[in-house]
């Protein structure tokens, strides 16, 4: 059901973002452009397809900016630098119900209690449990941990995706857009090694396949560099104007962090911890599940911290952005509808002291 909903509501999700002002790349005819991405194929892997709508190589960043601008436009209040420490659960009619969250104000060190009829967890992933990750320093799994400490279940936590192209030694992400635009992965001898692992779709094979292939090349001694511990992302055959227009972040990152000029040099890359498939189990309305059949009234989760099970053990590139927009919207709509008729659950007087 969740996968069907994701597919059916995907077009409207893109239209919604366009209507909010997201600057998608365009075709010469003025339509939203689409590019190839890893694992996006037709006829069960027979050929790659252009499926991914994009804004240069910073689509996620542009979604963030677009949504934030619309929040400002609508006068939505943000409590910046407030760090949520705990979810307050209150027993009502013999059942634990969410009533508030306790947050730590970084500027003052004070604890604050925020009561809510509906509470949505959109706390992201937990990539910082790994040594090398594309994730920000703040993504340490706090939201998922809060839910676990409340005795609620987690789902599919063993499924974690490693993105093939992190800057070698740093983990900073180089978008799959580079390979979507024709970038080639090569080993130390210059061989396009993905032709051996995925002869049909080569460098645009699913991420798990590409990451394993890269690790195997290094393990068998075909890695590049003085320690033979990475492979090379080659963009040198692409026209500079294509790189500048469609891959600006990739070129900036390579120059800034590695001192490599992508016009003339291949970029050292190696897999980096990237995305959690598992998290807080929800139904298709983003309601948090207490078990397979029971929801926690008034509690929702969306985005990387949630697990509605659309991705399985390894998601396709760009499907995370689609997931957060489709099910993030569903979470918001469901939370509003619940709050219209629900009453506030009482908050214990010592809620902050119990953290």
Language-model features: locations:
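Dinucleotide-binding Rossmann-like beta1-alpha1 core, especially the glycine-rich loop
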Residues: 1-24
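Short beta-strand to alpha-helix junction loop
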Residues: 2-8, 50-69, 79, 133-141, ...
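Conserved redox-cofactor binding core of oxidoreductases
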Residues: 18-110, 115, 122, 163-170
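Conserved mixed alpha/beta core segments that line enzyme active sites in large multi-domain catalysts
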Residues: 69, 77-129, 158-160, 249-250, ...
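Short FAD-binding loop at a beta-strand-to-alpha-helix junction that anchors the flavin cofactor
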Residues: 118-124, 285-287, 291-316
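Glycine-rich loop(s) and the adjacent beta-strand/alpha-helix scaffold that form part
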Residues: 118-172, 317-334
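An anion/pyrophosphate-binding glycine-rich loop and adjacent beta-alpha core
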Residues: 146, 152-268, 334-340
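Long, amphipathic alpha-helical stalk/connector segments used for oligomerization, subunit docking
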Residues: 337-355
């Amino acid at each position: 059901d969740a996968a069907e909903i994701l597919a059916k509501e995907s077009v409207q999700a893109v239209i919604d973002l366009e209507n909010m002002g997201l600057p998608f790349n365009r075709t010469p005819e003025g339509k939203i452009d689409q590019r190839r991405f890893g694992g996006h194929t037709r006829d069960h892997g027979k050929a790659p397809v252009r499926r991914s709508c994009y804004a240069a190589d910073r689509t996620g960043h542009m979604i963030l900016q677009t949504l934030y601008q619309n929040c400002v436009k609508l006068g939505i209040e943000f409590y910046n630098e407030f760090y949520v420490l705990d979810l307050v659960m209150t027993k009502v009619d013999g059942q634990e119900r969410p009533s508030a969250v306790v947050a730590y104000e970084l500027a003052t060190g004070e604890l604050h209690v925020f009561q809510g009829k509906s509470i949505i967890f959109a706390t992201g992933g937990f990539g910082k449990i790994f040594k090398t990750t594309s994730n920000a320093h703040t993504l340490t799994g706090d939201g998922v941990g809060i839910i676990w400490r409340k005795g609620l279940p987690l789902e599919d936590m063993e499924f974690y995706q490693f993105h093939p192209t992190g800057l070698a030694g740093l983990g900073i992400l180089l978008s799959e857009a580079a390979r979507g635009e024709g970038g080639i992965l090569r080993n130390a001898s210059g061989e396009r090694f993905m032709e051996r692992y995925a002869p049909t779709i080569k460098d645009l094979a699913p991420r798990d396949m590409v990451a394993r292939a890269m690790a195997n090349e290094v393990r068998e001694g075909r890695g590049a560099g003085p320690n033979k511990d990475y492979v090379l992302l080659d963009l040198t055959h692409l026209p500079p104007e294509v790189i500048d227009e469609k891959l600006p972040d990739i070129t900036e990152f390579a120059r800034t962090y590695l001192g490599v000029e992508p016009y003339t040099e291949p970029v050292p890359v190696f897999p980096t911890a990237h995305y959690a498939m598992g998290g807080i189990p929800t139904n298709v309305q983003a309601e948090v599940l207490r078990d397979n059949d029971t929801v926690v009234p008034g509690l929702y989760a969306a985005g990387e911290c949630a697990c509605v099970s659309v991705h399985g053990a390894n998601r396709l590139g760009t499907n995370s952005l689609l997931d957060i927009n489709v099910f993030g919207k569903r979470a918001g709509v469901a939370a509003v509808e619940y709050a219209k008729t629900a009453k506030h659950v009482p908050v214990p007087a010592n809620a902050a002291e119990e953290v």
